[in-house]
Amino acid sequence: MKENTHPNYREVVFQDMSSDFSFVTRSTIQTKESIVWKDGKEYPLAKIEVSSESHPFYTGTQKIMDTAGRVEKFRQKFGSKAGKAAK
């Protein structure tokens, strides 16, 4: 087998920037930053914007879109021309 053809698979700390939540997992991501974890070891640090700790679907703060407002806005803008043509 050829040497150095596969990326380095190692433990990496992922830090959610919006909720300040961090976790260690294995990844091939390349990072320039590192952090000392709770166990005293130094790991590469990958900063992410959203994780399961901050995503609305997982936190239960998901908002449902109100599409009725869009339909009413469309009807006000274009009227009911489509309804007249169908008759």
UniProtKB/Swiss-Prot annotation:
Coiled coil: none annotated. GO terms for molecular function: structural constituent of ribosome. The keyword Ribonucleoprotein applies. It holds the Pfam family Ribosomal_L31. The keyword Cell division does not apply. GO terms for biological process: translation. Keywords: Ribonucleoprotein, Ribosomal protein. NCBIfam families: L31, PRK01678.1. Belongs to the bacterial ribosomal protein bL31 family. Type B subfamily. Part of the 50S ribosomal subunit. This is Large ribosomal subunit protein bL31B. The lineage of its organism: Bacteria, Pseudomonadati, Pseudomonadota, Betaproteobacteria, Burkholderiales. The gene is rpmE2.
